[in-house]
Structures are given as structure tokens and as C-alpha cells.
């Protein structure tokens, strides 16, 4: 495991065989736009992201269902559970389902039920990963994928065998987006062509991982919303990078859901701060509203209560943080990221 300290950030970045600027420049040269098909898919696949919150224990053969109008099109399409799975250690959950109307196999992962706990107690540890040389991945996200990878992979294989002409899609909201990214990357390596759709996903790993996933065959659609704080974490200064491109819903945030295609701004680059990454604030409503209420079918919704049962002293201390203190902390990360990118760019010029 790599424990990344703030003092080691510059050394880590300079030692990287693929610099931030080189990778960002290469991606910036690509012409990326949003088609009406893309936009329609953004609005559709978030329904699967929402459905994962209330179908992760559904039996095989059951229809995907959501309360709170969480997945109306998925339901009307007759999507059927192939397998569901939960991780007792990490709390990850999700399902694999077939959609006979769209002729698709969807593997979907839910996010954290208590997003405040995650924001408050986030660690920045990275583990080595085997996807590519120099690959580093957030240890928590890797542990979550490891816990359910066998079940998810077997379910996708079973669904493909029964429906060989169906397209495969990996979907996730919030922390589920991070796991969907790892699932998609690993399934592709295993020979399963697929597209990845994530909503409000945090950064998953280092430059090498971000470059590897972004350059795999298959669509990569990472959607962010206004000032959602989750995609700004873990910070760039701790060696984390995003997959590219980013599709940013550049509206007012909050509980806004009526976005149009003209509201979508595309930003390229693993370390870009031109879209969501450069925003400030603690707009949790933006995290919970991607074209709809993403927690509509979760019993009681996604919690914003403080963490009260920490077992580690360091976690317990952070758990006493007020919302104002948490917002200040997250804003400080963004400012440090901006300064880091500015300084690194000046050294490269």
C-alpha cells in the first residue's frame, strides 16, 4: 500500500513516467462533443445508477423496480435481474440486469448511503494495481471491487452467454461510479467490450490508471454536476487523476434536474480544473440530483447525518467537523490543486 503524504506529492508527480501536462495536452487535442444520443443516454443510465440503491439484494429473475419514480424507463423496458451482490466488509452493492428492449446487459453499482461520513473520513491511500505499469488505485475502491468482482464478473459472463448480441454497460453513481470504472476496466481486459457511465464519481487512481482507462476501447462517459464536491476528491495534490473526458452539467446545481444538452460542457484532461474540479462549496444536493433524484428509491434517502460510531481516534476527531469546517477543508484542497497545477505548469514552461 502507498500512504501518500502532502510532502511526497511533488516527488510523486515528477517521478511519474507520464506527466500531467503531457497526458492532458494529448487529450485536449481530441474533438469531443455531446450528441443527442449521448445526452439521452446520460438521462437513461442514471436510472440504473439510482436503481442500484434498492435492487442490490434482489433475487435472480426479479424485475428491476424502484420506488419514488427512480427508474421508470428501466422498469417499462422490463429489465430483469441476472444476479445481485453486496459486500459485507465494504458495503458495496449492485446488480447485473438484462434489458430486452435496449438489448443491453447493465452492471450497476450503488454509492455510499452516508455521503457525509465518506467526505469527512476520506483517506488517500493507494494500492498498486495490475492493469498497467505504474498503476495506482484508491485502496478503498479497490477493496470494494475485489469484494464483489467474482460475483459481478460471473453474472456478466452468464448474461452474455444467454444474450451474445447484447451490449454491455457499466454504471455507477457516487462511490459506485468509482467501482463501475474499475469493473469496466477489468471486464474490458478480460475480453468484454463495454461502455462506462459514471455520475458524481470521485477520482479513482493515479495518472497511469486514468490514462489506461481513458484509452481503452469503448465509451467513457464521466458526468459531473455543477459544484458537486465528490468528483473533486481525492485531491490532485495526493496523486489522483480523473478519467477523461468530463461531461459537466454547468447549471446552478442544488436540486436542479431540468438540464438541456446546451448545459453540458465537455472538459478534457486528467487534471483539468476548468469544469467541476475548479468549483468550491459543499453542494450535496448537486451530488444527489443528476437529471433526477439519485436516491429516490433508497429507503430514507442518502444520509447527511454526522458519523457517531468511529472506532479510530483520527476518524472520531474528523467526525466532529461542522458543515462549515468540512466545506472549508474541501475548498482548501481545491485551492491547493489550483496552485499545484499552476506551479507545475510554470516549471514545465
UniProtKB/Swiss-Prot annotation:
Induction: Expression is induced by lipid-containing substrates and repressed by glucose. Expression is regulated by several transcription factors including MYT3, SAS, and gzzc258. Expression is detected 1 day post-infection of wheat spikes. Transcript accumulation reached its highest level in 6 hour old cultures.
Signal peptide (residue range): 1-15
Localization terms from the record: Secreted
pH dependence remark: Optimum pH is 7.0.
Superkingdom: Eukaryota
GO function term, MF aspect, one: metal ion binding
Record has Mitochondrion as a keyword: no
SUPFAM superfamilies per record: alpha/beta-Hydrolases
UniProt keyword Hydrolase, yes or no: yes
Catalytic activities: a monoacylglycerol + H2O = glycerol + a fatty acid + H(+); a diacylglycerol + H2O = a monoacylglycerol + a fatty acid + H(+)
Active-site residue numbers: 174 (nucleophile), 228
Primary site of residence: secreted
Disulfide bonds: none
Gene Ontology annotations for the cellular component aspect, listed alphabetically: extracellular region
Keyword terms: Glycoprotein, Hydrolase, Lipid degradation, Lipid metabolism, Metal-binding, Secreted, Signal
E.C. no: 3.1.1.-
InterPro entries per UniProt: AB_hydrolase_fold, Fungal_lipase-type, Mono/diacylglycerol_lipase_N, Sec_MonoDiacylglyc_Lipase
GO terms for biological process, alphabetical: lipid catabolic process
Residues modified by glycosylation: 346
Influence of temperature on activity: Optimum temperature is 35 to 38 degrees Celsius.
Family designation: Belongs to the AB hydrolase superfamily. Lipase family. Class 3 subfamily.
Record PANTHER family: ALPHA/BETA-HYDROLASES SUPERFAMILY PROTEIN, FUNGAL LIPASE-LIKE DOMAIN-CONTAINING PROTEIN
UniProt protein name: Secreted mono- and diacylglycerol lipase 1
